[in-house]
Amino acid sequence: MRHFWLLPAVAGIAGAQCPYLSGEMSFTQEQDNAGDTIEVTEQPIDNTLYVNDTGSYMTTDFGTPISDQTSLKAGPRGPTLLEDFIFRQKLQRFDHERVPERVVHARGAGAYGTFKSYADWSNVTAADFLSANDKETPMFCRFSTVVGFRGSVDTARDVHGHACRFYTDEGNYDIVGINFAPFFIQDAIQFPDLVHAIKPMPNNEIPQAATAHTSAWDFFSQQSTALHSALWLMSGNGIPRSFRHMNGYGVHSFRFVAANGTSKVVRTPWKSQQGVASLVWDEAQAAAGKNSDYHRQDLYNAMPNGHYPKYELQAQIMDEADMLRFGFDLLDPTKLVPEEVVPYTPLGMMELNANPTNYFAEVEQAGFQPGHVVPGIDFTDDPLLQGRLFSYLDTQLTRHGGPNFEQIPVNRPRKPVHNNNRDGFGQQQIPTNNWAYTPNSMSNGYPMQANQTQGHGFFTAPYRYASGHLVRQTSPTFNDHWSQPAMFWNSLIPAEQQMVVNAIVFENSKVNSPHVRKNVVNQLNMVNNNLAVRVARGLGLDEPSPNPTYYTSNKTSNVGTFGKPLLSIEGLQVGFLASNSHPESIKQGQAMAAQFSAAGVDLNIVTEAYADGVNTTYALSDAIDFDALIIADGVQSLFASPALANQMNSTATSTLYPPARPFQILVDSFRYGKPVAAVGSGSVALKNAGIDSSRSGVYTGSSETTEKIAKEVLEGLYTFRFVDRFALDE
């Protein structure tokens, strides 16, 4: 121990002799290409804002060419000098690289795209982006989770943000939505309470990105408006397969206003053209541990591979007189409008086609606001919406340090901005008008005031008016908090109902207050007795007697994530389990790959080690990586069950991957409800795993029938999950 002090000195001497620390590394062509400049794809951002460092010298922020790898010192071993402006600027910029993360929706991913209108919708709205058939508008979308911090996992059970910006010819229009049709609260003044309840406990900041704790379920059981969204959260909607496989909902009622002043009340969801799909809970937890960027990676990889996510913008268009017509209030954001009551009108299609060039500059700095509207779009008196109009604007001041956040490239409109707003932190414009006030005569009154007839300015729906006494009360038309949760429950297939029960039991098993768990069961009993009884059994509580005041047999369509085939299988992943010790298995996978590629599906050949034609290895793979699985002919020795893993002819145990990894991939894929197939002797693996080849979604055949097997797997991918594999408690 007395010689320990020598170690830093010795390390320093050794380091001085290391050629890689000399600053004179030589680059091979392979090394040089490893950090290629990112190709800037066509995006609605001024190209002059992109920085290309190719062939350049290092400079300071103010343009002086420099060398920034060694501090300025008084002699080689002397103190660093305060005058070293290169050191000070480099460290200062590093110290301030981060901005405050969003309080909610901190973790996200984004993409650019294009919206194309299906028709001229000027009979219902003056919005220019909907004014002509095939009119195209650039887009930027950000998808996110809500509760977790920026470094949390993608597959946490959570509400998911679905915010989309139209860069229209008349300014930016944002639909700031989520993947649930209802929200948890009716009044924005309760939003801090909701967020404080669902965030980690303040004493220990546990749990991260989860509502499986006391304060969340205490709030849900006390604030019964939250029940509807809580059931959506416990269903597959809380753990989507990807951002590509979830819908987006604007939640609120807005108004479309035509040029003649007539207005309609609208709800405007985005419907995924891939179809809606979700993970199962064990799979979501495995993904959280194996790949915390599960959803980000899926979106980022999709577009370069030619899989462009599509979402159809739809509208439920209702008359102003319909506000109370359907048995609930259209101003209530905790309610959805069943599509059987008001069908959806398809307005246009959005296709995402380009990744951001820089995550921080574009995704992190994007600031969406429900107050970003254009002529032809107007608000309603929804009390949650009214509060969001303030909150989303206000939060940008803290995140960006001042009022000029709209000048950040991703936030800039694609038309010139003219107003009398001036100065502030981070001002990026140079105004030339010295007369920044209205009215003025010195600049001939410019910029002029725009209205509906001059300048195509924003205008408020003439129908709108306000009168009444000033009160702090909720409208009686908002008081039914249980009928729509009951309708949602009724609309789920039995397997997804079981998932809801299991999720509620799982989360409340982590609630450390007995009276909160009892309150949860009591509230669920207001929704549906069968639901409450099954949860009570799982929590070891007394089974409640029916409380039928709000019970209903009503159902609606397309609110669950199971039981309907996908609309498209493009971009899904199939694992082909092969072996280096049986080269023919790799060739077999290569032969089948073309058939999958023609359907837009990626076939990934998995072996013990990389080789020609191999996409990945068993050490890197897990059942979460694939939407379907095929076992090659001749590789059955990889799939000995754990009890037989040590038998002489088994290669199930290897230093190249964790014990029994191929076997575990097979077992988990089947357990998660995925299509599973085996070619030839690969069917032995199914037998070892206890998988009956006659089960739905299980396909077998000889090595001469691979084309048939591939076709069956492709058909199985449309089903996506075979729910007969999931146990039901009744």
Curated annotation (Swiss-Prot):
Enzyme Commission number(s) from the entry: 1.11.1.6
Top-tier EC class: oxidoreductase
Coiled coil: none
Keyword Disulfide bond: no
CDD domains: GATase1_catalase
PROSITE patterns found in the cross-reference section: CATALASE_1, CATALASE_2, CATALASE_3
Record GO biological process: hydrogen peroxide catabolic process; response to oxidative stress
Family annotation (Pfam families): Catalase, Catalase-rel, Catalase_C
Keyword terms of this UniProt record: Heme, Hydrogen peroxide, Iron, Metal-binding, Oxidoreductase, Peroxidase
Cofactor(s) required, per the database record: heme
Domain of life: Eukaryota
Sequence similarity: Belongs to the catalase family.
Protein name: Catalase R
Source organism (scientific name): Aspergillus niger
